[in-house]
Amino acid sequence: MAEEQREISHENNVSLGSAETAIPLTNVSISPTKKEEQKTVYLVLFGRTIYVESSSLESEETVMPIVDVPKSPAKEDLTTHCSLDAESSEKGFPVDPYMGILGNNPNINSNVTCAGNKDLTEDIIKFKKMRSLSKEKIVEEKGTRVLTELPPYTWTIKKTLKESDINHQCRLLLNTTDAENHIMRHLPTDDQKKIQEGIGVDVKAYDHDTYTEHDMVFKRHVKTSKSYVFNGGWAKAFVGRRELKEGDKIGLFWAKKSQTFMSQEQQGTSPLNTDEALKSHHSFSQNPNYIESNLSRRYQTNFSLGSQRISGQFLMIPNPGFVDTSSMTNTHDTSLANFQTVPTTTNPKIILKEEKENEEEQQYWTIKKELTKSDACQRLTLSKSSVEEHILKHLLPEDSQKIDKGKPGITVKVYDNDTDTEHELCLAFQCSYVLKNGWVKTFVKRRGLEEGDMIGLFWECSTSKLHFSVLFRVNAKAPAAEEKEAY
């Protein structure tokens, strides 16, 4: 039987840059007088010959679907003819085009790819399915896939807000160890030097609950407490906007580049838009020990903040996980009216964990005392055992002798951790150990202390200072005297 061979002209070649999932060949025609004859037609694609029976070309359109397969490193040189369409590149799919020829001839190789023969795998089927999804579904499907592959990251800095963190002082006080281990070490050397000299460094703070970015200043009080703080926007952008209160628990982590997974620079794709960030959101409110790294991929030199209510409820917008953003725009309303409050967990294990964290935080305060009436009116009386165990053993022998009964005592520097201020008191022994000569003025009146309030003290050996903090107040409302204090 006579056979006819011909090459498909250039205008009939298949373009792999098309965004369509199926490309018909409409210009292949067979002479009507030879329809009954059995003919063989071959296609030449990138130097590879594919034989096809003419019967498979009798229909008006020959459908040639394009699906995605993983790239073959060994045959990467053969993929230079292939180009992903712009839409696929934006989605960041790490795949190459796959072409399959439909036909009834069992000898036809239907697994011809630009990289050579490759059997269909479970991944190919999954990518093929994703090609047929809408843009919104692809983002959701991709987000789900990435979420399962990403390693967990922790909220490395957690803090239960104190009164001084939310009042007029307009700063968030950080634990020195946390700040140095989880923030300072990741900053450029120049910024570290500035901070150690007392110069503030501008940072971007991403609110993980409201998907908003804010400016703050990270600095250190080098002349007084040596403490690290965030200010320059903390009060307005977080305390006021989020209505943070004393007792709220917040989480922080620094999203450094080395922590990112599939970073945008590595993938060569554009930054995540707001909807994608919403799709992949994993809130501190839902799980204080986990973050989803899509956030890190976008904010690679910033730190992120999430908040959680301890007193019964926590604030969050929107609900965690994958959410429907069809009714949202890129400019999201983050007003407090749109905040959703949901009950906190009732899981006994989580409750016990939170209580344990609070206990660990209070272990810094080796001396704790509930103020008596005389403490609020005259001087602070401390138990003999607590002073001898946690203060005297850290003093020089000559200083310890000055505290003996009948001696005037010694002057000690007392750093108020809540207000970031330093004061001087006299530690003496009068039937019991006391702090006097300024206690009533600089602490009771300035801080508005009352009978029943719980305070904490601990001695810092490296600076030879006594640290002070109000751990609990009988009346939670901030006193007027403290509100008027200048920062």
Curated annotation (Swiss-Prot):
Q: List, alphabetically, the Gene3D superfamilies matched.
A: DNA-binding pseudobarrel domain (2.40.330.10)
Q: Point out the DNA-binding stretch(es).
A: 171-269, 379-474
Name of the protein described by the UniProt record: Putative B3 domain-containing protein At1g78640
Q: A Gene Ontology CC term for this entry?
A: nucleus
Coarsely, its chief localization is nucleus
Q: Name one GO molecular function term.
A: DNA binding
The UniProt entry, under InterPro entries, shows: B3_DNA-bd, B3_domain, DNA-bd_pseudobarrel_sf
UniProt keyword annotations, A-Z: DNA-binding, Nucleus, Repeat, Transcription, Transcription regulation
Its localization reads: Nucleus
Task: Give the organism, scientific name.
Answer: Arabidopsis thaliana (Mouse-ear cress)
